Amino acid sequence: MSFIHLRVASAFSMKYGTTQPGDLVEQAREYAMPALALTDRATLSGAIRFAKACVANGVAPIIGINLPIEITVSDKKTPEQRVTVLAHGDGGWAHLVRLLTGLHINKGEGSTRITLELLEKFSAHSTHLHLLHGPQSPLSYELAAHHPERALDLFNATREFFADHAIECVSHLVAGNGPGSTAHAARSLVFARDHDIDAVITNAVRMRSRSDGPVADLLDCARQLVPLNYRHIERRNAEGYLKSSQEMTLVATEIARAAGEATPRALLKTTREWAERALLSPARDIGLGGIHLPEPHIVGATSQSSMRTLLRSRVEAGIHWRYNANADVKAARIRLDDELATVASLGYESYF
């Protein structure tokens, strides 16, 4: 069974991802993967380019966003906490766009981020989306500190605001017990099993291949405006790349065994199920190939016919403001009738 990556950052994650969306899709096609996710940091800027590349390469798109989250009072030494929100394949794209728009508009003087207050405000959209609690999530840091009770409290704080939740197990084969290690991924898996929460495996991808590691280091330091130095870079090795299905199966096996499970079958099965629920149709869900115009209510109308009436009244008012002579007004009306007929035949009233 082919693996499907659920968390992938492209170069549209400014000063973080190393690879253009199209190149990531081409790599997924070379691996014979049926689908690929794009989950850039706080932006959907690369989503359309990604979806077009998916169509060209015969790969199904999955789209989400990776966002900072503030649901606890963080110590200054604690790294920025983040979660990943995924659109599902039944209207999820529209809700994802509206949620991100709402977060941007209400960010105040800080950066775009999720808070409990904003989740309450935009729950009409967030409750149609899926949430991944990954190694940078508040829950994950509590697990790393061996506080499973606090981790559960944090999970419950966001439970009602999303359609589904999953614990994201990530191992970059880092030494020790912290995020990125197999030990931490296994602890996350055990936590999910203990509390009947779905668990999925991702590779928290930010590179196409291991050779992109030095580029990732430069981006880390440029993002922080600090000199290039080991203490300023995020990665501890070059494992955060777009791995093949075989490579991900090996990682899943290591995590599962460390968690006391004989095989990674359940972990891989749940990951595949989550991917299948998040598959988007480029045409139906995203609207590729279609024409997108403002809805009637945006321009103060209630229907297509009322938009025609509104447009005619506005342009006729413009005629009388611009022309005084009866002959000029008459000629303008004849021209206006022809042009409005063309606009009506195309359904473009709201554009004008």
Enumerate the predicted regions with their spans.
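Acidic/polar loop patches that form or flank catalytic/metal-binding clefts of enzymes
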Residues: I167, A199-I201, S281-I286
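Non-catalytic structural connector segments
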Residues: M1-L6, A192, R257-F352
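Extended substrate/RNA-proximal surfaces in nucleic-acid metabolism proteins
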Residues: M1-A35, R41-D198, G213-R223, A266-K269, ...
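Eukaryotic intrinsically disordered, low-complexity regulatory linkers and tails enriched in Ser/Thr/Pro
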Residues: F161, E247-T249
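Flexible glycine/proline-rich, aromatic-decorated loop/lid segments
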Residues: R208-S244
